[in-house]
Structures are given as structure tokens and as C-alpha cells.
Amino acid sequence: MNLWKIFFAIFVLFSPTITYSHSMEKIQNTYVLVHGMTGGGWDWKLIDNLLSQDGHEVYRPTLTGLGERMHLTHADIDLTTHIKDIVNLIKFEQLDNIVLVGHSYGGMVITGVMNELPEKIQHAFFLDAMVPDHGMSALDVAGKYINFTTKNGLVYPPWLNSKLSIPRDIPHPAKTLTEKVNFDDKVAKKISATYINFTPETLIKRERSINSSWQRAEKRGWEIKTLDSDHNAQRSNPEALKKLLVTF
């Protein structure tokens, strides 16, 4: 009995210290990374590794019909399908206080997610991404820059190369580019966001003058950053991109 009393006294004595130490641990973030057109969750593997090493929780889902889910592709996959992919991930994994990241076409998807689950998102990153207003489609945002061969409900951009080994970019469901997105929720419009443009430093001035997504982000008062990179910095310059994703 005496030994038990001694143990209990020691426990009580040191409990405040233990509790205090735990409270001082840095709270990390939960990232949901949404890939772009023709890509997949595999696109984020390098970024995932870098963020995870720092203790962040990372989800990198693949949108229906793409990547390792290419066997599910069909002509009726639309933007709503892809938005639901992410909405359901958030609901079923019971995620909260999310850092939502969208690359390229993924900007259309995360815009729809922001509109449906604004209370779940602490910050959004648009990485060289489409920034639509309410009622705009990807075609409306990109205009003349999307003029691809279409066959059996799929688009075939010029960067596809079937000779490359897997993982690789694959044909993309065409309806995802023509469906208009909803972005009319008042809370969604107040979510803090950062727009990061991937472009060589020598072309920044020109890019800002012609890029309507950049201009819409600026008009909304979002933070604007640039990264000297090609369009797929998550593949070609992951270390630099990761540094930007943890600063907001």
C-alpha cells in the first residue's frame, strides 16, 4: 500500500508537466490535394512525402475515371462527379479544418467543394489553377486554351503519351469541362485562399495581364504568389512548392 501511495504522489506531482508538454506540441494540418486534368492522386506523391515528413496528414484522392480509377471512365462523368469524389472523402473520413489544394482543372473541383462544405475548410490553394466565378465552366475559364481532340466522350490533350509507363496522364472525361460550377455560398466566398501561378520569372508580367484566373483571384483579395516553374511544379519542383503550401 505504501508503494502505491508513493507512485500516486509521483504521478500527481509530474502530471502538470506532462500535460503542459503535450499542449506545446505543434498542431499540424490536414491537406486534401486535388489533381488536375488527365492526372491522378499519383501526381502528388512527392508532395505527400514532404508534407507527411513534417507531420501533416495528407489525402491525395484520384478523381473518377482517371489514374488508377481509369477503369471507371465513361462519357457521363461530369464536374459534379468529381466534386462529389472530394465531398464524400471529406465526409466519410470525417475531416475538418482542411487545407484544400487544387491544381489546374482541380481549381474547378475545389471551387465546388468550397461551395458545398465551406465550414470544413480553413484555407484553399489554387495552384496554377482555374478560378471560376459562379456559373462558369472550365471551357469558360480557359477559353481558347482548351481545344482538344474529343472521342467517345473523352478529350485527348496533346501532352498525352501512351508510350510512357504507368503512372501517366490519360484521356479526360469531356463533360467535366462543360458543366458549370456553383460558387454562390456566402460563407464559401469568405474562405481565405492563395493563388499561386507557376511561370518563369521573365513571363510574370505578361502572365498577369492575360490570365483571367489570376485576375479573378486578385479581385477577390486573395494572396497572390508565383513560383518559377513549369505547369506541373508538383512533379518538377516539389520542394519549393511544399514550402509555399505550409505558409498561409
Spell out what each predicted region is:
Residues 167-186, 208-209:
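Active-site nucleophile elbow and catalytic-triad environment of alpha/beta-hydrolase enzymes
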Residues 101-102, 106, 110:
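Gly/Ala-rich beta-loop-alpha elbow adjacent to hydrolase catalytic centers
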Residues 75, 115, 120-121, 125-157, ...:
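Flexible "cap/lid" loop of the alpha/beta hydrolase fold
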Residues 62, 99, 122-125:
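Residue in the alpha/beta-hydrolase core beta-strand immediately N-terminal to the catalytic nucleophile
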Residues 51-71:
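Conserved alpha/beta-hydrolase
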Residues 200-228, 235, 248:
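Conserved loop-alpha-helix segment in the C-terminal half of the alpha/beta-hydrolase fold
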Residues 36-40, 104:
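Active-site glycine-rich loops that stabilize anionic/oxyanionic intermediates
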